[in-house]
Amino acid sequence: AGQGYGMNWKGDRGFLFEGALTTPSAITTLKFEIGVSDADDDAGAVNGKAAASATAGDFAVFVFDTDDDTNLAFISAKGGTVVATQDIDAVTIATSTTYRFAIRVEDDNVTAWVNGTKVGAAHLIEGGTAVTPWAFARARTGSANREAVWNKWRMIEPAFQ
C-alpha cells in the first residue's frame, strides 16, 4: 500500500502540497505516485496510466509507470471519474535523482509543478473531499525490488478563510 498521513485537507479551504522524491538506482519496471489522495491504503491511486483507471475517488498525483511508457504524467480524478491525464514532456525521469513536486488546490481546481516549473492546470478534484499527502512505489511484476525515497513533504493551507 501507499503512504498517507490523514484526511486533513480540503480543496474548498485551499492547500498547497509539496514533496521531494528520489528515484532508485534502476527505474526499469517501476511505478511511483506522489501527490494527494482521498485514500491512504490503496495499492496505488492510479491502476493504469495508459487507460487512466483509478482505485482512489478524488486525487491529484504525478505518476511514472514503465508498464505504460517512460513519461511522467499528472492525473487527477473527481468523484471517482478520472478527469485529466497529462504527460509531462518537460521532465525526464532519471535514476538516483531527486525531484520536487508541488500541487496547489483551490476549490475543485488543481495546478501542478515539477522542480519549480508549472506543468499542469485545469485538472479537477472534489474540493469538499478530505485528502492526504500520498506516495506510492512498487516494482512491476517479475522485477527486482525498487525503492523510491520520499525525502520530504508538507501540506499548508491559508490561515484565513
What are these language model-derived features?
Residues 126-161:
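Ligand-recognition surfaces built from glycine- and aromatic
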Residues 77-100:
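Short, aromatic/His-centered strand-loop micro-motif at the edge of beta-sheets
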Residues 88-89, 114-133:
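Short, solvent-exposed beta-strand-to-loop segments that form ligand-recognition rims
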Residues 1-72:
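Secretory/extracellular carbohydrate-interaction modules
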Residues 17-19, 97-106, 110-112:
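Short tryptophan-centered beta-strand motifs in secreted/extracellular beta-sheet-rich domains
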Residues 33-37, 60-65, 74-77, 102-104, ...:
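Beta-strand-rich, repetitive solenoid scaffolds
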